[in-house]
């Protein structure tokens, strides 16, 4: 009871399957497909935004891998978006199937961009949302894809259809910013290595590979991390 008292229910309501009253499970693949199709359905009130369902093939088990494009450009094809001049932001969730928070958060974000408080953002940017990059892993609550490959380690060889789908989005929409949402355990490596738990609930980190362009690192720090912290 003492621990529960420290974590009261937040004063917000999210309209996703996982947060339905009495629900104990997360949003299923079938529910996610229906939700994305519903947001992209003709006739949905979007305040002038174009919402397009992007079909990116299927997972190794045959589950559709789908994303949403949200824009105020009249034409929603990649070439037209580049001519329009608005930068594109790509948001990716649940590359690791046992890290579901990213997918659930991106569902809410998509809803807010289409019909909620975040609609004004589309005046300035295009947004592509891939809420569940690894549907097979999500279905089985496993980190890896159906073949046992970690899709988050497959962005060079592109052996898996899940990594190929992300590469397709990057290639076609040329995002200025890519946000890849993950989770980390509380009782994990930090306890084993340091005998302590991490003191933060969220971490924001940009790529730090050795051969990365100095300009990209500088841009990530000055155009992304610092503005996020300042906000």
Regions found by a protein language model. Give the residues of each.
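M14 metallocarboxypeptidase catalytic domain recognition
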Residues: 1-231
């Amino acid at each position: 009871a003492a621990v529960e008292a420290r974590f009261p229910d937040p004063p917000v309501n999210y309209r996703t399957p996982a947060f339905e009253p009495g629900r104990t499970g997360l949003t299923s693949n079938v529910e996610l497909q229906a939700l994305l199709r519903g947001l992209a359905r003709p006739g949905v009130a979007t305040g002038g935004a174009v919402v397009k369902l992007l079909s990116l093939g299927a997972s190794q088990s045959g589950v559709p891998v789908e994303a949403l494009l949200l824009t105020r450009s009249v034409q929603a094809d990649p070439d037209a978006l580049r001519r329009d001049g608005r930068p594109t932001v790509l948001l990716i969730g649940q590359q690791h199937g046992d890290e579901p928070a990213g997918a659930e958060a991106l569902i809410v974000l998509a809803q807010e961009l289409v019909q909620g408080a975040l609609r004004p953002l589309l005046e300035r940017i295009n947004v592509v949302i891939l809420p569940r990059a690894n549907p097979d892993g999500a279905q089985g609550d496993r980190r890896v894809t159906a073949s046992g490959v970690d899709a988050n380690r497959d962005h060079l060889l592109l052996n898996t259809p899940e990594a190929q789908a992300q590469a397709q989005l990057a290639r076609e929409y040329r995002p200025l910013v890519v946000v890849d949402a993950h989770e980390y355990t509380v009782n994990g490596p930090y306890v084993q290595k340091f005998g302590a738990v991490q003191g933060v609930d969220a971490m924001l980190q940009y790529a730090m590979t050795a051969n990365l362009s100095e300009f990209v690192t500088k841009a990530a720090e000055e155009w992304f991390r610092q503005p996020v912290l300042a906000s």
